[in-house]
């Protein structure tokens, strides 16, 4: 079976996590063997392991994460989704495209009511608030490096009567938790992480 056929099958009939992960490892290993010169991946991994989890976090905060929510209201949609949206037909409004993308993330993450869920890099809370509303018995912990983002999310949660969402303000270099989670989600944050292996070792389920 080709990778395209296997991926199509997995999308039509969701498979258990352990099956998907095993398949992903095989595909990644096969691709690495084709496109990665010998030793390059190991050298890159060693270089990453010597770095902090996140670099230039303070600069990123000064540039945009610490700006007031009113600024982002000028160009983000009603969900304040600070990542890509989804336009299946190209005719969707920004708000509709936000909602469709959020629903896709929820579906692909295999989320369910009653789970302990951790979101790393929650932005302005679009996914966290969506999860909290959709899964009222779930317990959601959201991590952001921005005090304005935390204040905004907590205010929105109060407005919506959501009591199952806790927001933590923390630099990813310092974040650690002893809690166990059923799901860990992160949308468009890992490209900012220099040493993602160190981060995952702190938050693994």
Residue ranges of predicted features:
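N-terminal auxiliary segments of SAM/dcSAM-dependent transferases
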Residues: 2-73
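Conserved class I S-adenosyl-L-methionine
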Residues: 114-123
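Conserved SAM-binding strand-loop segment of SAM-dependent methyltransferases
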Residues: 159-172
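Conserved SAM-binding loop of SAM-dependent methyltransferases across substrates and taxa
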Residues: 124-136
């Amino acid at each position: 079976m080709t990778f395209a056929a296997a991926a199509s099958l997995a999308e039509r009939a969701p498979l258990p996590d352990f099956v998907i992960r095993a398949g992903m490892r095989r595909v990644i290993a096969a691709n690495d063997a084709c496109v990665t010169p010998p030793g390059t991946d190991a050298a890159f991994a060693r270089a990453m392991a010597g770095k902090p989890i996140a670099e230039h976090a303070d600069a990123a905060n000064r540039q945009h994460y610490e700006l007031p929510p009113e600024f982002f209201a000028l160009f983000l949609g009603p969900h304040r989704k600070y990542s890509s949206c989804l336009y299946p037909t190209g005719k969707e409004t920004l708000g509709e495209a936000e909602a469709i993308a959020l629903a896709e993330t929820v579906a692909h993450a295999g989320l369910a009511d009653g789970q302990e869920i951790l979101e790393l890099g929650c932005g302005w809370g679009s996914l966290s608030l969506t999860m909290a509303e959709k899964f009222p018995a779930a317990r959601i912990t959201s991590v952001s490096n921005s005090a304005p983002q935390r204040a905004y999310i907590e205010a929105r949660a109060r407005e919506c009567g959501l009591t199952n969402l806790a927001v933590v303000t923390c630099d990813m270099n310092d974040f650690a938790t002893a809690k166990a989670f059923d799901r860990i989600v992160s949308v468009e944050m890992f490209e900012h992480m220099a040493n993602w292996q160190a981060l995952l070792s702190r938050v693994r389920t």
